[in-house]
Amino acid sequence: MARRDFIKQTAAAAAATVAGVPLTGYTQNIVTESEAAKLKWSKAPCRFCGTGCGVNVAVKDNQVVATHGDFNAEVNKGLNCVKGYFLSKIMYGSDRLTQPLLRMKDGKYAKDGEFAPVSWDQAFDVMAEQFKRVLKDKGPEAVGMFGSGQWTVWEGYAALKLMKAGFRTNNLDPNARHCMASAAVGFMRTFGADEPMGCYDDIENADAFVLWGSNMAEMHPILWTRVTDRRLSAPATKVAVLSTFEHRSYELADLTLTFEPQSDLAILNYIANHIIRTKRVNRDFVDKHTVFREGNADIGYGLRPEHPLQQAARNAGDAGGSKPITFDDFARFVSKYDLEYTAKLSGVPKNRLEELAELYADPKVRVTSFWTMGFNQHTRGVWCNNMVYNIHLLTGKISTPGNSPFSLTGQPSACGTAREVGTFSHRLPADLVVTNPEHRRHAEEIWKLPDGTIPSKVGAHAVLQNRMLKDGKINAYWVMVNNNMQAAANLMNEGLPGYRNPENFIVVSDAYPTVTTLSADLILPAAMWVEKEGAYGNAERRTQFWHQLVDAPGQARSDLWQLVEFSKRFKVEEVWPADLLAKKPEYRGKTLYDVLFANGKVNQFPNTELDAEYANQEAQAFGFYLQKGLFEEYAEFGRGHGHDLAPFDVYHKARGLRWPVVDGKETLWRYREGSDPYVKPGTGFQFYGNPDGKAVIFALPYEPPPEAPDKEYPFWLSTGRVLEHWHSGSMTRRVPELYKAFPEAVCFMHPDDAQALGVRRGVEVEVVSRRGRMRTRVETRGRDKPPRGLVFVPWFDAGQLINKVTLDATDPISFQTDFKKCAVKIVKV
């Protein structure tokens, strides 16, 4: 056996062993027998998290039969986690959706009917009829779409054009609202531009890692292997982990801090105070490159307006507001957060708080901060993001190798599609926003649309969409590549009622039956991953392409095909007002397809430019290289504006490039002279997203959560993920090995709490909140070890819907839901 083959097998076996997954002889040997098996290998990014690992995909007889880590991929260097190891199986569940299904009774669509197979023409006929009815009766604000950070770049871009330019509604939002909205808004508030300034190379250059609400060992395991390698190969390196409960990342940590939920706000301010008090502020950096502002406090919790907490909030109507202050004002503001106060509020021992603060304060220690949902799924998630930037800016530990505040991403293209393309309800591509008239005009110019096409009003975000569906304000709704009925908080009160509202027509495009598809009126079968040509953008700004490698089963079609084909059903005069059409009379009689996708730009690349080795069903269907046309039009937004993308064809050859890509060269560290081509010579650093080129340090307080344990509901509930499953489990639970490794969700609980309740490991209990209840089983010995008074329940299990229980409170600036904190009681069944 060759050394490389041995390494491949060892890496795969290690990944599987983490989850206790058995390896069959066939899957062990298939990567070493490629010649004998006549396999065709091609590159692709992994389908799961936002790490963006490269994989090699083997195809035989129009089926994916094996995958392994791509040794030429800079991100993972040949390694895959256990989910990545079983990628070859995610497309072949026995219940794969292969034809459109419509609720019918007596041969016609009926809201209370049963699902029956229909053709694509029938499906689109009914769907178009319903959308036209709603547009005519109520206008574009009654139409909505909920998309995904799993959309390819061009799928998201096509959806953006169809909704915001075609139907003229900003009621488009991605499921990234649930995971990355606070990170995105945090970047915009501090730097005036979204996405990290650093890259994964920071890992090999850092002297210390601080994890804030991030279980990287399970959620970003390949990056964790790089952190582990750095920690073990450079013994002076330190790892600190902060969380509300103990998890697998604690095993590597030199310093652990288990804190009271919500008190991370106080800890962040304590660190800033410590840096100032011990005179370790990098005054030269701060004076040249930062300004100070105090953010509005008492901003509410994103609940319905009539909720008492919203009524009582002083600044609920201006949650993102702020005013200028000085450095001295900031120093006075954080001085309250001294060691005594912070230790008491957080429950963290004083010596551990001091040790953590010293990692940041010591000018000789290069620090990389990582965070994910613990920060972002937080009613003050934007503040958390702003406050960790405060620490890095005060010390000047930013935009240099090893010094990086780094928001990790949960979905494969939450960055590349949701954020960069701009599929949020307030955004357009390349950090443009719908509220800015110049931004709208720029988009309309690129899209060859009349002035005033794109509406200026911010659309409904994810949580508001559910509320508007329930209230009958959104009536035609399309859901793609997500399982929001399982994923959204308070689902029985705010999710399901809207989907089953008789006034509403709900379309769900997916590859498998889910809780969401079963709540729909029309189900459209979707192609997955390498069944289509695609592009993702990962957490380090790396854009990666792949070819279509196999055909989708049955009548399943890509989301891109669905979006573009559906646009043919609408004449421009059916969806645009007469005054708008009068500005472009040549569009009269044309379809949205003609105006948006056959506009002379998107359709400019002929099919002769396709790689003859690979199929492309969309190009075959529409007669031109659709993906290339969409990408090149989209790239116009960013080129010359700090979001430069390379030419389309380059990405099919490369293992991804980190933008901005200028003159063929990618950018590793943004905002630093010598690394970022947009930084002017002589400035050193330039945070050019803001007009003055300076980053903002925000004074922000600790504020309590909207709900906390009390006598009736004495436990904190936190939800999250586990290594073996991804999000709602609709893919991973159909992989037998992953299902066997972790078949059902459980309620992780401290043994003393279990004893006090009179329950043992494996006993069935109900988790009950003010909103609902669900059944699960107690686990007191597992990998996750909550402190007394807190329970943790993963949300991957469709048979145990923990979001019946959770609270739909959000950060009032980003509108991202806090899935980490609500009050529950545990009742023995």
From Swiss-Prot:
It comes from Bordetella bronchiseptica (strain ATCC BAA-588 / NCTC 13252 / RB50). GO terms for cellular component: membrane; nitrate reductase complex; periplasmic space. Coiled coil: none annotated. [4Fe-4S] cluster binds at residues 46, 49, 53, 81. PANTHER family: PERIPLASMIC NITRATE REDUCTASE (PTHR43105:SF11), RESPIRATORY NITRATE REDUCTASE (PTHR43105). This is Periplasmic nitrate reductase. PROSITE patterns: 4FE4S_MOW_BIS_MGD (PS51669), MOLYBDOPTERIN_PROK_1 (PS00551). CDD domains: MopB_CT_Nitrate-R-NapA-like (cd02791), MopB_Nitrate-R-NapA-like (cd02754). Binds 1 [4Fe-4S] cluster. It is found in: Periplasm. The gene is napA. GO terms for molecular function: 4 iron, 4 sulfur cluster binding; electron transfer activity; iron ion binding; molybdenum ion binding; molybdopterin cofactor binding; nitrate reductase (cytochrome) activity. Residues 39-95 form the 4Fe-4S Mo/W bis-MGD-type domain. Substrate binds at residue 795. It is an enzyme of class 1 (oxidoreductase).
